Amino acid sequence: DDRIIDGTTLRLNPDEVKLLYNNASYLIAMGVTDFSEISRDDVLDAYEDMEEEAGLLIPHPQNEPVIGVIDTQFNEKVYFHEWVEYKNLLDPNIPLSRKDYEHGTAVSYIIVDGPQGNPELADGCGRFRVRHFGVATNNGFSSFTVLKMIRNIVASNRDIKVWNLSLGSKLEIKPNFISPEAAELDRIQSEYDVIFVVAGTNIPAGVTKKNMRIGSPADSLNSMVVNAVDFAGNSASYTRIGPVLSFFHKPDVSYYGGDGTVYTDKMVVCKDDMGAAYVAGTSFAAP
């Protein structure tokens, strides 16, 4: 058995460790110290520590890189909350509903622990910590207000070099000029030496137009703009197209965003403290 290192050392998963504690705890005690030196309290404390560690769905964060997320709000009751530093930048007088937390929480989940529910996302890069700024509600937002917030956020968090922005307009960009939102995003990236990863925007529900152009700020030239594909690599049914100014190819890349009518075709996310949810969209391809 490749899990046995020598006559007294072997590798076990948490469930096997718990089973060993229950059925043959003296074997572990002999391997640690003289059994006569262990009190009943020592055994109970060690068992409680082991149970707590086995029950963790995710390890504690350490010195992992930090990604900035600018989105709707973040639900601090989710299992990975330790990995996310959250700041609500909306006026405290603005009432928030449960829906206002779902989109932003799902986006940060993908960055922190996406491969947990989506094995296709496992790229060997590990987990990332997130600094999450809530700038919008689920009901919509003023793009100019958000852009002003983004400039202040980036200026105040110079240690973060990569930012995720999964917010965008339902309207199409104009064929002959870059949107004011994208132009400002380009300026911010140039001034502060950062890069934004921007969702390529979705075709809104109920719209039947084919070849719908992307919405701002997905026409940002300096940003990495991400469209979505299904798990077979086909372009998702809700994706929109470029180019920008007739010759800048946008979106730049595509990644898994989920698509289809059954839950197995969608992305698994944690958007609240109620368990897994199934979603699709460029918002979840970008992170």
Predicted region positions:
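Autoinhibitory propeptides
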Residues: 1-58
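Short, surface-exposed basic-aromatic patches at helix termini and helix-loop junctions that form
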Residues: 22-26, 187-190, 215-220, 245
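Long, acidic, intrinsically disordered low-complexity segments
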Residues: 36-69, 234-248
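Subtilisin-like serine protease catalytic core
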Residues: 56-87, 94-143, 193, 220-222, ...
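Extracellular S/T/G-rich loop segment that most often corresponds to the catalytic His/Ser-adjacent loop
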Residues: 71-73, 79, 213-287
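Solvent-exposed loop/turn segments at secondary-structure junctions
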Residues: 73-75, 138, 169-171, 202-205, ...
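Gly/Ser-rich catalytic serine loop of serine hydrolases
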Residues: 93-105, 276-287
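Substrate-binding/access-modulating region of protease and related hydrolase catalytic domains
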Residues: 136-216, 276-280, 284
